[in-house]
Amino acid sequence: MVHKALHGSAWRELDYLFVENVGNLVCPAVYDLGQSVNVVALSVTEGEDKPLKYPVMFRKADLVLLTKIDLLPHLDLDLAALEDGLARVMPVPRVIRLSARSGDGVASWLAWLEERRSVLAAQARAGRAGHGHPHEHV
């Protein structure tokens, strides 16, 4: 839906387009928007049960941003259980711990975005756009 709307539009000049879900971890996991990557933002305040409670969302994720990590000292969160849950549902769990308050992880998040953009641009130049129809994606 989003992908189709972007074809032939002025949006082609964008390097990144973020589409945020409706605010929960269950609804948007089953919809294909034509996206190139899936990133799940999981706040440490949500608890360690979320990967096992919403496995589809995490299984489809290319990356999990574990957010609000500056709050960890104030929470009763079992980080090992959370990481175990991610390992059980994700083919290759990739996690970046992030704090907007302290800035921890922001450089890693930006580097990951740039690396993914570069890979996708190279695939597009080689004609391997990756989602079933031929054209350039940069």
Where are these regions (language model features)?
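Conserved nucleotide-binding/hydrolysis micro-motifs of P-loop NTPases
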Residues: 23-25, 44-49, 69-72, 101-104
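A generic structural signal for alpha->beta connector loops
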Residues: 13-15, 35, 92
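Inter-motif core of Ras-like GTPase G domains
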Residues: 9-10, 21, 28-46, 53-66
